[in-house]
UniProtKB/Swiss-Prot annotation:
It comes from Simian retrovirus SRV-2. This is Gag-Pro-Pol polyprotein. Gag polyprotein: Late-budding domains (L domains) are short sequence motifs essential for viral particle release. They can occur individually or in close proximity within structural proteins. They interacts with sorting cellular proteins of the multivesicular body (MVB) pathway. Most of these proteins are class E vacuolar protein sorting factors belonging to ESCRT-I, ESCRT-II or ESCRT-III complexes. Phosphorylated protein pp24 and phosphorylated protein pp18 contains one L domain: a PPXY motif which binds to the WW domains of the ubiquitin ligase NEDD4. The keyword Ligase does not apply. Residues 956-1144 form the Reverse transcriptase domain.
Amino acid sequence: MGQELSQHELYVEQLKKALKTRGVKVKGNDLLKFFDFVKDTCPWFPQEGTIDIKRWRRVGDCFQDYYNTFGPEKIPVTAFSYWNLIKDLIDKKEADPQVMAAVTQTEKILKVSSQTDLRDNSHNKDMDLISLESDDEEAKAPSEKMTMSNKSPKKYPAMLASQNNNTDKDPDLSEVDWDGLEDEAAKYHNPDWPPFLSRPPPYNRTAATAPAVMAVVNPKEELKEKISQLEEQIKLEELHQSLIIRLQKLKTGNERVTSSGNIESHSRTPKWPGQCLPKGKYLINKNTEEYPPKDIFPVTETMDGQGQAWRHHNGFDFTVIKELKTAVSQYGATAPYTLAIVESIADNWLTPTDWNTLVRAVLSGGDHLIWKSEFFENCRDTAKRNQQAGNGWDFDMLTGSGNYANTDAQMQYDPGLFAQIQAAATNAWRKLPVKGDPGASLTGVKQGPDEPFADFVHRLITTAGRIFGNAEAGVDYVKQLAYENANPACQAAIRPYRKKTDLTGYIRLCSDIGPSYQQGLAMAAAFSGQTVKDLLNNKNKDRGGCFKCGKKGHFAKDCRDHSNKNPESKVPGLCPRCKRGKHWANECKSKTDSQGNPLPPHQGNRDEGPAPGPEASLWGSQLCSSQQQQSISKLNRASPGSAGLDLCSTTHTVLTPEMGPQTLATGVYGPLPPNTFGLILGRGSTTVKGLQIYPGVIDNDYTGEFKIMARAISSIITIPQGERIAQLVLLPLLRTAHKIQHPYRGDKNFGSSDIFWVQPITHQKPSLVLWLDGKAFTGLIDTGADVTIIKQEDWPSHWPTTETLTNLRGIGQSNNPRQSSKYLTWKDKENNSGLIKPFVIPNLPVNLWGRDLLSQMKIMMCSPNDIVTAQMLAQGYSPGKGLGKREDGILQPIPNSGQLDRKGFGNFLATAVDILAPQRYADPITWKSDEPVWVDQWPLTQEKLAAAQQLVQEQLQAGHIIESNSPWNTPIFVIKKKSGKWRLLQDLRAVNATMVLMGALQPGLPSPVAIPQGYFKIVIDLKDCFFTIPLQPVDQKRFAFSLPSTNFKQPMKRYQWKVLPQGMANSPTLCQKYVAAAIEPVRKSWAQMYIIHYMDDILIAGKLGEQVLQCFAQLKQALTTTGLQIAPEKVQLQDPYTYLGFQINGPKITNQKAVIRRDKLQTLNDFQKLLGDINWLRPYLHLTTGDLKPLFDILKGDSNPNSPRSLSEAALASLQKVETAIAEQFVTQIDYTQPLTFLIFNTTLTPTGLFWQNNPVMWVHLPASPKKVLLPYYDAIADLIILGRDNSKKYFGLEPSTIIQPYSKSQIHWLMQNTETWPIACASYAGNIDNHYPPNKLIQFCKLHAVVFPRIISKTPLDNALLVFTDGSSTGIAAYTFEKTTVRFKTSHTSAQLVELQALIAVLSAFPHRALNVYTDSAYLAHSIPLLETVSHIKHISDTAKFFLQCQQLIYNRSIPFYLGHIRAHSGLPGPLSQGNHITDLATKVVATTLTTNLTEAQTAHALHHLNAQSLRLMFKITREQARQIVKQCPTCVTYLPIPHFGVNPKGLVPNMLWQMDVTHYSEFGKLKYVHVSIDTFSGFLVATLQTGEATKHVIAHLLHCFSIIGQPIHIKTDNGPGYTSSNFRAFCSKLHIKHTFGIPYNPQGQGIVERAHLSLKNTLEKIKKGEWYPTQGSPRNILNHALFILNFLNLDAQNKSAADRFWHTSSKKEYAMVKWKDPLDNTWHGPDPVLIWGRGSVCVYSQTHDAARWLPERLVRQVSNVTQSRE
């Protein structure tokens, strides 16, 4: 099939006939063109020789690939439609017999007609009509194929007709030439098929079949004209119409008939034969008066019995809309389930109005706006294609706008147009945003500098939808924000069209704007000499003319001036550079020569200037450079006093932060004046603008061009030509005798660029060969893998692995993979090495090098700029080569830390600038408060002030301090060292109190004995470590200080530390962390090294000396990179090493020779320092605690550090032992290959431990002061075992293999059963515990002390022993009872324990030779006394140690054992033991013979409450003088003056009538320092509360507390504080009916009563806080409550009443003096009335007439003699 042309045409003819049987008429030429396209896209198809459904689907796959590759424009419009028709034909199992019968009958009818006329008119293309069937026959059941009226029409339904057998014999039908008619009719139906679908129909679920074109299509104007010309053939037209109706009836079976009247009334314009479409949305039924159905969607079409088509809206099921709405809400608009519903709905004919109604119903406002924008854009594109196809379907028809805005017009659309509408709508739906949570602020949605405008509009519309709900309501606002919130580039693009287009137009205008557009604008601005802003505003204006002559009107290629300069042009010959063409060498652009070898860049200067190297990249390069050379004499100064010469840029330059440092030409050339050199510095104004100028040095003998190294800091910077950006400072040249490497520099540069163009990643796999323990492995570099993985097939079988508990996850998952049991040494081709533990996984296709290995290799990932890459390629450079002219650049990327062995970046700065590492700081300090701390600077003497000024200047020059305006300040001072030099210190105690202290990172001192024997070592000391570690900038202001001046001659100069200050509490910890972080990379790279770091001392040790040196070199670089400096003079490379106060000489470690100065040992502080140093050395000396005990005893006594101390003879002998031991003793380094033994010696007082390996390794000592008062020796040995095991793991990382101690196995067995410490000490110990010491003289010397084991005190009661009971009382009486005899005696102690201990001593002294069973009711003695037999040292505390020593001597002197048991006192149990204890207890009781006197009680009460003399006199009935003497003898009360008597402030007449209230401060209560005080003026009862402030809420809280104690007052008087004058407090008083008045402002006398109460309260607080009662350790509330208790209940007045008595128990009867008084208002006399209060100059009279009190001057009152009145 298809191999010959005739066969090709024959196949097409047969295919036409086959299609015709299905009612489909196509054009033969179109089918030929279709199979030509099949042949082009499927070359294999003609060779198949046959066709079936499988091969035809393969053709469809080829169409799909072609469509995806070239798009819809390159594929024929009818390709997929024909493919679908043929697919249905091939897939059909059998022909439809009804269709076959109809065809046969039609042929007969057409033959009767005028066949000749038809044939003549067969070439009239405009008369042919076509009917295409699009129903998917394959998907239908046979019953469905027969009846179509019950199915809703598909997306492209065929015309429906009634199935009526009676019409088969229509006499009006005649025969016609069907072949010619079908060919001609097919032409009018190609436009009916939808030519532009979003996806080809065979692969679109919503359009799975080809579109079927209606029998009546949208006619053209030419068709109308030709129909009018063929009026004579009307009979043929009628027959043709009947034919079509008949065929459609057979196919659809629709027999619906409508009267002709209806047809005529609902016809549309233009009208085509055989079709009449209604304008209405529903069919009018004349026979009924039913209401028309609801107008919804979609459009359906039916045919009546007369062959007339009717369209109307069918009622759509609203459950589908609800389902779609639910899917959008729950899953999102673009979820697969939602799209499936939309595609199902799109199978119907939905008009544009229907789509808009549906979308508005189910989508939010923002999403609806997005859909509408996308739908209009799709329709606009489709309309353009329709215009090219000439089918007349314009934008208004597709969108339902303009003349097609109503549903009537949209119902008349052709099926092909409906198909395009459905495609545009579904495509717009698919572009809806994914369900998310956009922001709520619409004005806050702004476009980023590199964000695409479409993404920005999408975010804006989404946010608008959430805010407005209906996006159309805010479309104008969204459009305005889309312009205002766009970035400058997009605003410039939109500005000319801002009012001429909508959001869709905005998106099109900004579609090409992105990062590359921004960079292009910057380049264009530089080319044109404009700023970016000016360029954007003027980009549509004329940009100029010729680049050669500068004139407008022509281009450079047509410039006559340029051509006239060289009238006689020479013809170039063969290029001497590439030898491949005829052109000039300076114009050669070849990258390779004729042999294919790469060519180097151009050498020398050409018209374009020097070859582009590091100093001339295209970004920031010369764009319009001037070629004039200027000397330094041409430079200008800004002013006569300017130190620098101005340097300008000769180019219009654009710099971006991504470009890094760039060189700028200045046009100034050397040399400099004689004996000078130049320093290039930046101007301050350029730094403010964001341009950083790197400083550079210009040599005196440099004759080349001076260039400026500049970098844009954070944004794009445009440097106009001629702008001053730097200055050249000339300095005198100092010539030294250093070695000269080059005789003369000239215009040459030293070295090459440090830049290396990294080769980009290609399709080739990035593999790498590494050696693991000498075996080569090839693997892929995987930056996404955390760990390195080796496939099991490559893993050697003899290399051990272990199963891990981790899971590896990637594309797959590996549970519990195996990992190498040991670290493997990796090595690459450059001999770089490290350690790695890879994982081993089976069935892995390739080995993977993960980040655990790549980080050790220092592999870096670079993202090159595409523009830079293109520029480099254009200049002839290749990746992998240096960019210098000699291509000898360093072949590695520039690291972030800079290169310390090379200076500069580029050429001209090769000897000028160091690219320093990024500044590192110490960790930030956490502060408790941000409130500034200011401590005034104290005065300094003239000598110390001069020293301080000199030291400050030195620190200022060193950069350790800077000038400061900080609000913090702490004083400084200077001290003179032994060498005579001064040292600057700062008192930072106040600052330290405000910071959170960091814990110690190294709680112990590292020991050099843990270094393995035989290791090579290097010792390093860091220079001024604190001063090389910078503080965090935010912390520097807190360490400010002031430098004073004598006689305040000038303001103090203020400075602050930039580095760690000495004296700051966290400086040691920050120093350790900073240095440790610098060393950490070296530790990881050299894991096999033994590296010790303590503060600023570092020790490196290793097996191989070469590795130690390499590690030292890397460590040196790491320290230098972080700013730390190594002191060269303190680097130790050979024995003997001095480290941390020890001398290391081979395996031996000795202490440095020390001479102890005795003349300085005078105070407790001196001896404390000395013994601290000696105790530090004890691990390396075999000095026992007993040897040092005389020295330790000196520390006892007075705790004052300056208290005098002196050396006793025993202490002097101990000091000599220390000196001898320091000089003679040594220890050795540990050998990890030998077992480690821990020896315990039973030395005097406490045992001593020693780690042993044929020589002493480390001595271990217990603390000089035991934790317990009585520590048995065997418990001390157990404590030493615990300490030794801990030290072994702490220093050596292992447990001792053997512990040798002095007890035998039986004794250890006893200790395990009867003590608590021994089982703990030996718990989980897997080694050996022995008592056989190695044969060594040192060990034998240490074994001289005998072992003490209990033998006198029995653990159980003895038989036939004397029964004794002991007891003691706090009365000082001790007693013991034996054999019905009681002995009691008086002691001088009041402690019951000490008294009973003396009773026990008396028992042991009375019966030294008798066996005893002693019972005591003291559990403490019953536990302590049995320990005395084995205690070697008793801790001295008070008098207890003295009695324990006496008791211990009695035990040692006994030869007969005794038993000491405990019995509970007052148990009430029967029996002789309880009875004997009770008798003894009664003997300690004493009957008081004298009562405590009142004076003693008064003294006790005053000591407890500090009562005044009057209260003591009245309460305890003592004399006035005795009470006064008690108060005078009190050291607390004597400092407080007596409180004056109550004054004359108005008082309440009854309780709670008048209160005074105020607030006082007591700072010692901290946050509760605000003490609110209220006092009842009648009784003086005081109520106070602690509050955290003085606001109204605190006042109200205080009053509520007062109400709960003494009730509610009638009247409250306060001052004018804000808490009392507020409206809230006024409302509070008003609601409770409390009268509130204020005193006289700023006059405290108006509040005199409460002010005196403040004084009384504070004095009481001060008194009781110094006492010995519990409130001194209590909370502030306890102390306040105690004071109120004293003032209200204990202090008595002259009537022997307290304030509480006066308040709660007022007198029921009282006599008042009677007076007459004059009213000053009317000068009338009244009375006699009683006097309530008679004050100083004033009298309070109670007017019985007015029932109110009146205050009157004393002069207006006359007393009635001897007249009184009682008041009940």
